[in-house]
């Protein structure tokens, strides 16, 4: 089994033209989030094909399927993860290989420390080990999943009950608060 759990984010949420590190930071983000996933898959897939079985889990993000202002390039790379995973699954499922894309919401980690709103209920941001157990229990059920029940709700319910303009506005507010939180932490 190959798990492509790669992720690089900006130092803090920021408008695209103002990202610290400029275009080089964006290039690095693309290299880590997309190029390394492709390279590892190309490295491991031949052995899976020769054995006639295998599994690849590619970690995307809810940012790749939901409004994600102030992390534009990151969100775009995570959208790529889904397209790569679903089309690769179509190519290799008949050869016994399952390829799945997981789009988690907030999971407690070093990378997400500034992004998780303080008022967010704990069940919406599980510890990494709890998320992994949930994700593995769902492996092979669908090609694309959020991996965790509460993240399923965050993915499915908002488009059903809120207009897109409201979801975009809320996402901007959440990411603006995350930006503020990160900048305040950097000042200390």
Regions found by a protein language model. Give the residues of each.
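Active-site helix of classical SDR
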Residues: 41, 77
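Residue(s) in the substrate-gating loop at a strand-loop-helix junction
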Residues: 61
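Flexible, glycine/small-residue catalytic loop immediately N-terminal to the helix bearing the conserved Tyr-Lys
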Residues: 13, 48, 66-70, 92
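SDR active-site lid
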Residues: 89-170
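Conserved mid-core segment of classical short-chain dehydrogenase/reductases
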Residues: 9-27, 70
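A short helix-coil junction within the Rossmann-fold of NAD(P)-dependent oxidoreductases
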Residues: 9-13, 43-52
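Conserved hydrophobic beta-strands of the Rossmann-like cofactor-binding core
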Residues: 2-3
């Amino acid at each position: 089994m190959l798990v492509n759990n790669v992720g690089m984010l900006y130092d803090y949420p920021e408008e695209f033209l103002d990202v610290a590190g400029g275009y080089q930071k964006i290039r690095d983000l693309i290299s880590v989030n997309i190029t390394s996933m492709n390279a590892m898959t190309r490295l491991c897939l031949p052995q899976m094909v020769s054995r006639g079985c295998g599994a690849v889990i590619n970690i995307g993000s809810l940012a790749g399927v939901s409004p994600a202002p102030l992390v534009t390039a990151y969100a775009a790379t995570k959208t790529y993860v889904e397209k790569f995973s679903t089309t690769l699954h179509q190519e290799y499922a008949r050869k016994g290989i399952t390829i799945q894309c997981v789009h988690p919401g907030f999971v407690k980690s070093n990378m997400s420390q500034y992004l998780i709103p303080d008022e967010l209920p704990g069940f919406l941001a599980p510890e990494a080990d709890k998320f992994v157990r949930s994700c593995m229990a769902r492996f092979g059920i669908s090609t694309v999943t959020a991996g965790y029940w509460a993240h399923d709700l965050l993915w499915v319910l908002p488009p059903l009950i809120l207009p897109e303009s409201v979801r975009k506005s809320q996402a901007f507010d959440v990411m603006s608060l995350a930006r503020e939180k990160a900048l305040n932490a950097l000042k200390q």
